[in-house]
Each structure stands twice: as structure tokens, then as C-alpha cells.
């Protein structure tokens, strides 16, 4: 879990546009962010296995 202080700090408007970055909407993780789903890879995997993301299923070939 991300520290609460870092999440709050990131939500403030930044002085420069390049300082803005995405965080997972669920856990606040800043790395491995999937833009299409708005969450990190770990949360994506957890929610996909639970079937909570519509249209996503485990690949098999």
C-alpha cells in the first residue's frame, strides 16, 4: 500500500505538468499502471481473477 502522505501529495496540482503521474485507484501504487483500467497490474490481476472487470478473461490457447 502506498503511504497516505504520498497519495495526498500527488493529488495536489503540480507546478509543472511533467511532475504529474498516475496512481492506482484502488491501492495507490504508482508503478505498473494500466491506463485503460486505471489500476496497477497487481489489482488488475486480482480483480480479473474474481471476474469483476467486464470483458476480461484469462487467455488460453
From Swiss-Prot:
NCBIfam families: PRK08061.1. Its cofactor is Zn(2+). The keyword Coiled coil does not apply. Signal peptide: none annotated. It comes from Thermoanaerobacter pseudethanolicus (strain ATCC 33223 / 39E). HAMAP family: Ribosomal_uS14_2_B. The keyword Plastid does not apply. The gene is rpsZ. InterPro entries: Ribosomal_uS14, Ribosomal_uS14_bact, Ribosomal_uS14_CS, Ribosomal_uS14_sf. Binds 1 zinc ion per subunit. This is Small ribosomal subunit protein uS14. It holds the Pfam family Ribosomal_S14. GO terms for biological process: translation. Belongs to the universal ribosomal protein uS14 family. Zinc-binding uS14 subfamily. It comes from the Bacteria. The lineage of its organism: Bacteria, Bacillati, Bacillota, Clostridia, Thermoanaerobacterales. Keywords: Metal-binding, Ribonucleoprotein, Ribosomal protein, RNA-binding, rRNA-binding, Zinc. GO terms for molecular function: rRNA binding; structural constituent of ribosome; zinc ion binding. GO terms for cellular component: cytoplasm; small ribosomal subunit. Binds 16S rRNA, required for the assembly of 30S particles and may also be responsible for determining the conformation of the 16S rRNA at the A site. Part of the 30S ribosomal subunit. Contacts proteins S3 and S10. Zn(2+) binds at residues 24, 27, 40, 43. PROSITE patterns: RIBOSOMAL_S14.
Amino acid at each position: 500500500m502506498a503511504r497516505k502522505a504520498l497519495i495526498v501529495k500527488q493529488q495536489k496540482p503540480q507546478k509543472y505538468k511533467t511532475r504529474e503521474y498516475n496512481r492506482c485507484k484502488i491501492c495507490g501504487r504508482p508503478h505498473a499502471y494500466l491506463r485503460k483500467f486505471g489500476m496497477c497490474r497487481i489489482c488488475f490481476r486480482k480483480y480479473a481473477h474474481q471476474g469483476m472487470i467486464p470483458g476480461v478473461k484469462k487467455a488460453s490457447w
